[in-house]
């Protein structure tokens, strides 16, 4: 079952956007643009409609969830019986191909983690053909291809890709999900740590232009960042919502988000 809408956080590269649940699952992502078909659509259905979860294998408690400073870089921490782990989620500013980057950091102890990648194209209707190619995982469906580059090996099961791994204090594991037209050669994945630094710098530099210094400045800046994240970069148009088909009121007709 999808989470409550208030439990989702937005990440964006100003050409597309994803919703990340408090449980570590990306349940909504239209790739490569806001108006493209979704490759993760569990938000509107079930997990089988597509999601990508990176979280402690045995559960745990989400103890902290925040954006890093004045950015759209999301940071989530879990406390488990084995220790504490942090997951950083963001979408780098677009270079040639769109990316979703997830970085797992060990804070203390040694925490068993799991990545479950269940790609479903066309809003959950199409199960892609998945194979390992050139050290990456490739999921292809018609004209679309999504590639996963990671330092953690994945294996297939039940039409999904899984990775079980352990992260110790001070260690990092990285995941880069990239869209590309299926007729092109595989994309060159971004360097996750460099992309993190550049993404934080982009958002914080932009937010620093806000001259408002009155009450609730943090809330004002966060609202501006959210609007910027929903602004389609090539035209400056603001999308009505990052999602679709969520009712303004349950049972009512206002379902355009």
Could you say what each language-model-derived stretch is?
Residues 1-257:
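Acidic, mature catalytic/reactive cores of soluble proteins
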């Amino acid at each position: 079952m999808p989470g409550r809408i208030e439990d989702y956080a937005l990440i964006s590269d100003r050409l597309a956007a994803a919703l990340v649940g408090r449980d570590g699952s990306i349940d909504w992502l239209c790739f490569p643009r806001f108006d493209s078909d979704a490759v993760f659509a569990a938000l509107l259905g079930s997990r089988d409609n597509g999601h990508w979860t990176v979280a402690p294998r045995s559960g745990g408690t989400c103890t902290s969830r925040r954006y890093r400073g004045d950015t759209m870089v999301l940071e989530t921490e879990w406390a488990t019986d084995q220790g504490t782990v942090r997951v950083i989620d963001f979408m780098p500013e677009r270079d040639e191909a769109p990316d979703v980057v997830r970085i797992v950091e060990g804070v203390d102890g040694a925490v068993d983690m799991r990545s479950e990648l269940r790609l479903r194209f066309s809003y959950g209707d199409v199960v892609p053909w998945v194979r390992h190619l050139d050290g990456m995982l490739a999921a292809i469906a018609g004209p679309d291809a999504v590639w996963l580059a990671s330092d953690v090996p994945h294996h297939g099961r039940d039409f999904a890709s899984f990775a079980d791994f352990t992260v110790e204090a001070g260690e990092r594991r990285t995941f880069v999900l990239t869209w590309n037209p299926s007729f092109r050669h595989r994309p060159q994945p971004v360097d996750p740590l460099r992309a993190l630094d550049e993404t934080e710098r982009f958002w914080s530099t932009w937010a620093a232009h806000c001259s408002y210094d009155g009450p609730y400045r943090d809330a004002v800046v966060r609202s501006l960042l959210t609007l910027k994240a929903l602004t389609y970069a090539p035209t400056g148009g603001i999308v009505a919502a990052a999602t679709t088909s969520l009712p303004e009121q349950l049972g009512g007709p206002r379902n355009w988000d």
